[in-house]
Design a protein with these regions (language model features):
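Conserved catalytic core of the tyrosine transesterase superfamily
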Residues: 1-336
Length: 336
């Protein structure tokens, strides 16, 4: 249970216009710390009674007893620092117990991405869908994730008015933190999205500019339980994730089958490795994969930052960190 100071802090986050996801994350961090504090001290949480040694003990508990990742612990510390700074500004706290508590040092972790060959196999997996309407819809969904690097929620929130094929641009209105951005579209994405628009989403033509119909969702879902399985505007994030996972399984199976036909053992092993990665493919991995492809082909960090919608360049900089596979290849090359 959160004390009155914490509830005031959470209320001002809402007033300040912080995104709902940010508010939920902050509440979760604070609730986790409060629960630990109450169980440790056997009394109700009181922010004015928190001292530096409490925070150091909590860090040790999270790291050694719970095995939490350094990034997770540091995020919690950051939340507590902002809370205490605000409480002092409001004269609800005299001293800041977080002032001398450092973050846990950690080695930067490279965001997990898929190799180009695995992404290509995923794109080809849509051919296994027997319903041409769903196949084109899945191709459009993948085009947004693979070529534009949008988040899965952003893809599901895209409206018809957000896509301008004439100029080859896409407007993402529901970016993280409520930030919107305008993105250039890869030529392959333009062709795929245009084909989906003409044959599935708007076979009778686009709605009039400025009309209410323009605000309808770009992607469609299917009512499988209804006769004829009609399409309806809009697709839930959960369903979109399931489709990507399903396509990942199909692509993995196809690569496994290719491996059994491959005579070259090294090549067969590589195919199986890609198949293994695709078994757990996720939308966010496709976003990471775009960032790595852009950097590998000479893009600058600010360009990647703009595409992905990162607030801080340091977040984008993580893509420069060698992945485990990069290090593995480097070690193999260094052999005698």
């Amino acid at each position: 249970m959160l004390d009155h100071i914490l509830e005031q802090y959470l209320a001002q986050l809402s007033t300040a216009g912080k995104a709902p996801a940010t508010q939920r994350a902050v509440r979760s961090d604070l609730l986790q710390y409060c629960t630990w504090w109450e169980q440790t001290h056997q009394r109700l949480f009181d922010l004015t009674q928190v001292v530096e040694r409490d925070l150091r003990a909590w860090k040790m508990f999270r790291q050694q007893d719970e095995g939490a990742a350094p990034a997770t612990i540091n995020r919690g510390l950051s939340t507590l620092r902002r809370l205490c700074t605000w409480a002092i500004e409001q004269r609800l706290l005299i001293e800041n117990p977080t002032k001398e508590v450092p973050d846990i040092a950690s080695t930067p972790v490279s965001p997990h991405s898929l190799p180009d060959q695995a992404v290509d196999a995923l794109l080809r997996a849509t051919r296994a869908e027997p319903d041409p309407r769903l196949r084109l819809r899945d191709e459009a969904l993948l085009a947004l994730l693979v070529y534009a690097g949008v988040r899965i929620q952003e893809a599901c929130d895209i409206q018809l008015r957000d896509l301008d094929l004439a100029s080859g641009t896409l407007v993402v209105r529901s970016g993280k933190g409520g930030k919107a951005r305008r993105l250039p579209l890869h030529s392959e994405a333009q062709r795929t999205l245009g084909r989906y628009l003409r044959k599935v989403r708007c076979p009778e033509g686009l709605p009039p500019i400025g009309s209410e119909q323009e605000r309808a969702p770009f992607l469609v879902g299917m009512q499988r339980a209804v006769a004829g399985r009609p399409l309806v505007p809009g697709i839930k994030t959960r369903v979109a994730r399931q489709r990507i996972a399903h396509l990942g399984q199909i692509a993995a199976t196809q690569l496994e089958e290719a491996a059994t036909r491959e005579r070259d053992l090294e090549r067969a092993a590589q195919l199986r490795a890609w198949a293994h990665q695709l078994e757990t493919a996720s939308p966010h991995q496709l976003r990471h994969s775009l960032a790595r492809r852009m950097l590998k082909t000479g893009a600058q960090l600010p360009e990647v930052q703009r595409m992905l919608g990162h607030s801080r360049l340091s977040t984008t900089g993580l893509y420069l960190t060698p992945s485990e596979e990069d290090v593995r290849v480097a070690v193999e090359r260094a052999g005698l």
